[in-house]
């Protein structure tokens, strides 16, 4: 949040009443609440409350209300960091044959997915504002793999993705592509030296251009939903997102659609970014630094939240 004093909040996708009570007892009064309806990387529900998105145009926000009220019962002064689940419920993934969890860019290029997800977000935010607007201090948009806007589709094409790619090229003043580059072209490496893999801007022009689009399209989706949330809230509210993990994803960073972090950080519709600590430096004494390029983030007006979800010695 935009404040000068140190900021600390507690987040757990499970109920964890004892932990929340202990944090409240030491003065922590900001808690994350996630009204989830999607599953995690193990195929299990993210949370321990019932889902809120049940079918087309059918929502039940009672579990969300219960979750917030459970927090208030433990900490009457609680302020809420409200996480919005944009990922597909299992029934929607089966209905549309596209799942935003592994393939957020394919889902975003699917008109029906975007239509239904926008309707859910609208209904959820309107309800949240009506019932808990005086407690909610920010909204955090969650989508893609592990809800962190990562894409594991390896750039797979679809009719909607091709249409979006052509529109992106038109906005950039580039020639209209006949198709999305195939797998061999997308993954081709022209230069390799001491383990470093590089693409030649001439020889690999089509791949470089497509992967540029791949990340920008992901950010455009984030900003579209951020704008929607902003339009539904009549009071000043901050919006955040998990994005920009270029220091963690290593050789897969091009594929994961996290390269357009400067475009996201320059947008007035996003107020802060969130990043876990780096998972490659977890040994005792390690720093477990940020996944994001701090030198780029810090000069900009958007603060960076550090998500501390590492393992600690007993």
Describe every region a protein language model picked out.
Residues 1-2, 24-25, 74, 131-135, ...:
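Extracellular/periplasmic catalytic domains that process cell-envelope and extracellular macromolecules
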Residues 1-4, 50:
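Short, surface-exposed connector motifs at secondary-structure boundaries
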Residues 6-11, 29-33, 80-84, 137-141, ...:
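Hydrophobic faces of well-ordered beta-strands that scaffold small-molecule active sites
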Residues 7-23, 36-42, 54-64, 245-258, ...:
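Acidic-and-aromatic substrate-binding clefts and catalytic sites of carbohydrate-active enzymes
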Residues 16-105, 115-118, 125-128, 224-232:
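Aromatic-lined substrate-binding rim segments of carbohydrate-active enzymes
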Residues 26, 172, 232, 308-310:
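Residues at alpha-helix termini
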Residues 94-282, 287, 296-297:
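Polysaccharide-binding and catalytic clefts of secreted carbohydrate-active enzymes
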Residues 272-275, 295-299, 304-314:
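Active-site core of glycosidic bond-cleaving carbohydrate-active enzymes
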């Amino acid at each position: 949040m935009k404040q000068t004093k140190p900021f600390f909040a507690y987040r757990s996708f499970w109920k964890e009443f004892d932990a929340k009570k202990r944090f409240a007892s030491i003065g922590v009064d900001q808690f994350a609440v996630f009204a989830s309806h999607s599953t995690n990387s193990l195929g299990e529900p993210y949370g321990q409350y019932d889902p809120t998105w049940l079918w087309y145009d059918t929502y039940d926000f009672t579990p969300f209300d219960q979750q917030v009220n459970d927090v208030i019962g433990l900490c009457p002064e609680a302020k809420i960091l409200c996480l919005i689940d944009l990922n597909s419920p299992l029934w929607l993934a089966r209905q549309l044959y596209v799942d935003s969890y592994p393939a957020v860019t394919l889902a975003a290029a699917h008109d029906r997915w975007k239509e239904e997800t926008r309707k859910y977000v609208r209904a959820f935010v309107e309800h949240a504002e009506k019932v808990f607007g005086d407690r909610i201090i920010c909204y955090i948009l969650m989508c893609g793999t592990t809800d962190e806007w990562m894409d594991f589709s390896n750039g797979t094409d679809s009719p909607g993705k091709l249409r979006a790619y052509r529109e992106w090229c038109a906005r950039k003043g580039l020639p209209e592509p006949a198709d999305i580059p195939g797998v061999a072209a997308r993954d081709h490496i022209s230069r390799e030296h001491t383990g470093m893999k590089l693409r030649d801007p001439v020889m690999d022009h089509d791949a470089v251009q497509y992967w540029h689009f791949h990340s920008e399209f992901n950010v455009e989706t984030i900003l579209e939903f951020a704008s929607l949330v902003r339009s539904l809230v009549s009071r000043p509210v901050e919006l955040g997102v998990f994005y920009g993990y270029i220091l963690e994803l290593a050789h897969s960073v091009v594929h994961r659609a996290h390269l357009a972090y400067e475009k996201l950080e320059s947008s007035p519709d996003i107020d802060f970014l969130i990043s876990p600590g780096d998972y490659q430096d977890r040994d005792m004494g390690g720093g477990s630094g940020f996944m994001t390029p701090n030198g780029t983030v810090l000069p900009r007006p958007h603060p960076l939240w550090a998500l501390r979800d590492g393992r600690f010695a007993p």
